Amino acid sequence: MSGRGKGAKAKSKAKSRSSRAGLQFPVGRVHRFLKKGNYGNRVGAGAPVYLAAVLEYLTAEILELAGNAARDNKKSRIIPRHLQLAVRNDEELNKLLGGVTIAQGGVLPNIQTVLLPKKTGKSA
C-alpha cells in the first residue's frame, strides 16, 4: 500500500511559481521581500507574480537597448557606459530613471547650439 487512500493521485514534481507564470525572475523571493518590507499587513498571491513580471520586462528592455549600444560601439560586452547610453537615449526610461546615477556611466555627448561655430555665408 502506498498510503495515499483510494482515489488520490500520485504527488507530482514540485513546480516553482516562476515556472508556472513563465518567468525567469523569482516569484517566491519577491513575495518574501514584499512581506518583509512592511508594504502592508497581507500580500496577495498575484502581487509578487505581477511585480516579478514587471521587473523582468524592465530588465529585458534595458538589456536589449544596452546590447544595441554595445554593438554600435563594436563591443561584445555590456559595460556601465552602454547602460547609461541606453537609458538616457530612451525617453520613457530616462523619465523613469531620471534621478538615478549609473556609476562609471559618463554623460551623453551634447554641445549647445550657441557654442557651435557660426557658418559663414561665402557666395561664389
Swiss-Prot record:
The modification N5-methylglutamine is found at Q104. Its main location: nucleus. The modification Phosphoserine is found at S2. PROSITE patterns: HISTONE_H2A. Residues 1-21 are annotated as: Disordered. It is found in: Nucleus; Chromosome. The modification N-acetylserine is found at S2. The keyword Transmembrane helix does not apply. There is a cross-link at K119 (Glycyl lysine isopeptide (Lys-Gly) (interchain with G-Cter in ubiquitin)). The nucleosome is a histone octamer containing two molecules each of H2A, H2B, H3 and H4 assembled in one H3-H4 heterotetramer and two H2A-H2B heterodimers. The octamer wraps approximately 147 bp of DNA. This is Late histone H2A.2.1.
